[in-house]
């Protein structure tokens, strides 16, 4: 029997509203309660969506790509600009060439070679936070370390890390606030970095097993290169 789309007639009443607390214990408590009382819950927040709270439900839905798709909504809240990019906002088989190219650079053998580099970045960023004696673990450590992970994985110059950290953090905050103009402003900066990267790799291709941009440029869709606008 085909599954029915829940948004054909969304519930009139929300089952929950996400806690605004920054206390992890309170957040976990809300999820524990939902798992017990309403494991498949609906909220009208952010345009309305359903949330699964039990592992088996999440696993089964993630494995059923015919019923549960990404091409309608993949991120909550949605991009305020209405922009949709592969592979995140596409379903199989459309996303397959992109995932193939990306997965090629995430094999265990490559990640093993990056382990000591990323560990050094993590230790340095954490030490800076500790030496200051104060700070925000998410903003001061998480954002910076995530930028170093991207820089290392993409084979960017080290000087890109601080710029990437600041721009990505500002972009995420603007997205959360659904500030369309700010999202576009910071997104354009990220696109400029991506365009420069692909321009360099076209001129000087690298090993597709170790370089995501080179891997994407080498991938083909029906015998054709991935279009420029879908590489970003």
Indicate where each model-derived feature is located:
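Active-site substrate-recognition loop segments, prototypically the cytochrome P450 B′-helix/B-C loop
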Residues: 1-138, 142, 147-165, 169-177, ...
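Cytochrome P450 catalytic core segment centered on helix I
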Residues: 166-224
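Cytosolic ligand/metal-binding cores
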Residues: 227
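Cytochrome P450 catalytic-core helices
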Residues: 231-232
């Amino acid at each position: 029997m085909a599954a029915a789309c829940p948004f054909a007639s969304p519930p009139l009443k929300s089952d929950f509203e996400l806690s605004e607390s920054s206390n992890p214990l309170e957040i976990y408590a809300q999820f524990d309660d939902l798992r017990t009382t309403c494991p498949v819950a609906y909220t009208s927040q952010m345009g309305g969506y359903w949330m699964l709270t039990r592992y088996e439900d999440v696993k089964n839905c993630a494995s059923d790509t015919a019923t549960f798709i990404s091409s309608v909504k993949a991120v909550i809240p949605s991009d305020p600009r209405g922009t949709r990019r592969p592979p995140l906002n596409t379903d199989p088989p459309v996303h397959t060439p992109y995932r193939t190219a990306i997965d090629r650079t995430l094999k265990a053998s490559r990640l093993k070679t990056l382990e000591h580099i990323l560990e050094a970045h993590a230790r340095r960023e954490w030490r800076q936070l500790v030496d200051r004696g104060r700070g925000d673990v998410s903003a001061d450590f998480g954002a910076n370390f995530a930028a170093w992970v991207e820089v290392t994985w993409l084979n960017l110059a080290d000087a890109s890390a601080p710029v990437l950290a600041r721009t990505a953090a500002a972009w995420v905050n603007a997205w959360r606030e659904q500030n369309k103009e700010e999202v576009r402003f910071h997104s354009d900066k990220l696109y400029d970095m991506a365009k420069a990267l692909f321009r360099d790799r076209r001129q000087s291709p690298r090993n597709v097993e170790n370089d995501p941009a080179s891997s994407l440029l080498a991938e083909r869709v029906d015998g054709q290169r991935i279009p420029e606008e879908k590489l970003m």
